UniProtKB/Swiss-Prot annotation:
The modification Phosphoserine is found at residues 278, 301. Pathway: Amino-acid biosynthesis; L-proline biosynthesis; L-proline from L-glutamate 5-semialdehyde: step 1/1. The keyword Amino-acid biosynthesis applies. It catalyses: L-proline + NADP(+) = (S)-1-pyrroline-5-carboxylate + NADPH + 2 H(+); L-proline + NAD(+) = (S)-1-pyrroline-5-carboxylate + NADH + 2 H(+). This is Pyrroline-5-carboxylate reductase 1, mitochondrial. Keywords: Acetylation, Amino-acid biosynthesis, Mitochondrion, NADP, Oxidoreductase, Phosphoprotein, Proline biosynthesis, Stress response. L-proline binds at residues 164, 237-238. Coiled coil: none annotated. The keyword Heme does not apply. Homodecamer; composed of 5 homodimers. Interacts with LTO1. GO terms for biological process: cellular response to oxidative stress; L-proline biosynthetic process; negative regulation of oxidative stress-induced neuron intrinsic apoptotic signaling pathway; proline biosynthetic process; regulation of mitochondrial membrane potential. Pfam families: F420_oxidored, P5CR_dimer. Its EC number is 1.5.1.2. The gene is Pycr1.
Length: 309
């Protein structure tokens, strides 16, 4: 079995490194494509032995399982490009937030009457084999196709099959979840530094606290609230700290964050469906904006800003 990645960014690197570390796939059995062969993740993939190419069609030709690891709005253009190269043997796995199985199948059926499509949502901790992945199978994907993907993704963390209509919510929770955890950890470390701890030690203590708490929860059948209560002594330091969190709306902020991520995921699907702008146009628009902003900034600097004495 060979695996290909359309896109050679952070997700492709995380999965490729996870697969090779787990021993389920040798690096020479993996190929990734990117139009930018100078980006850092391309160099990182090359270092672990992954084959690289700037041509998406070459990745398709050398792959049995093909991961679409690009931004959602680019998916329609990628499918137009590679559709004619998709064969019966290919399992197309979309990792793009919000992009539905139906939208991918609709594109590919113009080239292949029964494309095997699987939609998944994973997260970056797959790089250390502690990821979370859910997947849903498409109209033409067989049971064994789903099992193959589950075997791959299960080698780099927890993996389970769900109904597709749950995947947007999963994106808001575990897909974006590592970013919530890193932000919380950064803030915890800042608190430690404020109270006198060295930065490196503060980060390590915070990370270990979160790791230990997660493991306690996964290894027990207790509700998170019960485990929280077990830490709080009457009149103690922890319950006073939790009062501060509750006063600041800590729970509501997390709930709202999950909701916001989920809603944005659905908006991304709408953008992908509209296909109103191509990747080349997006790149040109960004470059033009940078030039415009630079010119405006230079003008503002010369006309309105006096040099410091």
């Amino acid at each position: 079995m060979s695996v290909g990645f359309i896109g050679a960014g952070q997700l492709a690197f995380a999965l490729a490194k996870g697969f090779t570390a787990a021993g389920v796939l040798a690096a020479h059995k993996i190929m990734a494509s990117s139009p930018d062969m100078d980006q850092a993740t391309v160099s990182a993939l090359r270092k672990i032995g992954v084959n690289l190419t700037p041509h998406n069609k070459e990745t398709v030709r050398h792959s049995d399982v093909l991961f679409l690891a690009v931004k959602p709005h680019i998916i329609p253009f990628i499918l137009d490009e590679i559709g004619a190269n998709i064969e019966d043997r290919h399992i197309v796995v979309s990792c793009a937030a919000g992009v539905t199985i139906n939208s991918i199948e609709k594109k590919l059926t113009a080239f292949q009457p029964a494309p095997k499509v699987i939609r998944c949502m994973t997260n970056t901790p797959v790089v250390v084999r502690e990821g979370v992945t859910v997947y849903a199978t498409g109209t033409h994907a067989q049971v064994e196709d789903g099992r193959l993907v589950e075997q791959l993704m299960g080698s780099v963390g927890f993996c389970t099959e769900v109904e597709e209509d749950l995947i947007d919510a999963v994106t808001g929770l575990s897909g974006s979840g590592p970013a919530y955890a890193f932000t919380a950890l950064d803030a915890l470390a800042d608190g430690g530094v404020k109270m006198g701890l060295p930065r490196r030690l503060a980060v390590r203590l915070g990370a270990q606290a979160l790791l230990g708490a997660a493991k306690m929860l996964l290894d027990s059948e207790q509700h998170p609230s019960q485990l929280k209560d077990n830490v709080c002594s009457p009149g103690g330091a922890t319950i006073h700290a939790l009062h501060v969190l509750e006063s600041g709306g800590f729970r509501s902020l997390l709930i709202n964050a999950v909701e916001a991520s989920c809603i944005r995921t659905r908006e991304l699907q709408t953008m992908a469906d509209q296909e109103t702008i191509s990747p080349a146009a997006i790149k040109k628009t960004v470059l033009d904006k940078v030039k415009l902003d630079s010119s405006a900034g230079a003008s503002l600097s010369s006309d309105h800003v006096k040099p410091l004495p």
